[in-house]
Amino acid sequence: MIHIATIHWNTERWIDLQQNYLRKHFKSDFRVYAWLNNIPNAPTDSFYYASREPVDSHAVKLNILADIIHASSKREDDVLIFLDGDAFPVGDIETLINEKLSTVKIVAVQRLENNGDLQPHPCFCATTVGFWREIKGDWKEGYRWKNKNGEGVTDVGGNFLKKLTEHDVKWSPLLRSNKINLHPLFFGIYDDVIYHHGAGFRKGECRVDGANIQLKPRDKMLSKFIPGYGRRMRRKANHRLVANNDELSEQVFRTIQEDPRFYTQFM
């Protein structure tokens, strides 16, 4: 049995899309366990389990869903998948999981493109019910790693990376495989089998955009003489980037709705 933990927040528009791609690309039986926040009219009949409890932390919700899955699973070798609500398979994911988990304990997206993030990312992660329990899996942030600029950062999955590192657990990262990139982080294809929209439930702000903001020569000069000027200019530039990202996100979402093979434009 395959058990899938997913979270939808503030909108139900990804639910049917995700379910359709799951049915298309999984041949084995699977159950979906969902956390549905701020979506009072979201349908629940397609989920094996659904919670509407008002929990804010994304990581905590995933951890609780994993506990529920362990309690309902009958086999320690059942496959456990974590999947963001705006992510879904677009290729033969079941074969990939079976092949990878025959040699390693974890297969997960690693978003190196996000300024060098090292941790397994819960937009897609597969392991077994038994191993998650054995290692006391935890999606919360906390453990810090060095990004590509040598800065210490943490994010969701940080504590999971710590456990894998401390126990010397080998895992298989799925890396971004886009041939066409509309954005350096969003609209990602991983190993040609997983699509992750990115920021499908929130504003399109990300660390990699902020790190790449460059002030114009005039603004650089003025920032030397006017306290806080450079910071204000970076904030304005970031607001423009977020607005552009949101507009692009809506355009891509409309394409997803209209074209079941939308992902080929990125491959």
Predicted regions and their residues:
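Short beta-strand-to-loop acidic/aromatic patch adjacent to the donor-nucleotide binding site
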Residues: 76-88
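Conserved catalytic core of nucleotide-sugar-dependent glycosyltransferases
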Residues: 89-166
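Short, acidic, metal-binding catalytic loop of nucleotide-sugar glycosyltransferases
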Residues: 20-30
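Active-site-proximal specificity loops/subdomain of glycosyltransferases
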Residues: 34-77
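Catalytic core and acceptor-binding pocket of nucleotide-sugar-dependent glycosyltransferases
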Residues: 134-226
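Membrane-proximal basic amphipathic "stem/tether" segments
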Residues: 215-267
